Amino acid sequence: MKHILDLVDKVYKKENISYEQFIYLIKNGYKMQFYYKKRKFGSTQFDGYEFYEWNKDEGYQSYKTIEEFSDKINIDRKKLKDLWSDVKKIDFAD
């Protein structure tokens, strides 16, 4: 429990978190958002795990498991985990 609270605290303090920590927060029910190249992206959970770009109808991605979500989410066909060092403003979703 303390680990998740430490991560939540890091996000509130606007500290960087790793891709694995980002996925861990999502796995534990947190809706997240971030910016990549001035574009806003978010994640949520309805019927599995969803990833989307804000205010865009295309490009919505949905996966049944957190493992599939973690491995496959992408921006412009590039895996998010490979782009993570360029992600900015990681926060909880609005």
Regions found by a protein language model. Give the residues of each.
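Mixed-charge, Lys/Arg-enriched low-complexity segments
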Residues: H3-V11, K64-D94
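Acidic, low-complexity, intrinsically disordered interaction modules
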Residues: K27-Y30, F34-Y35, R39-N74, K81
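Negatively charged, low-complexity tracts enriched in Asp/Glu with abundant Ser/Thr
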Residues: M1-Q33
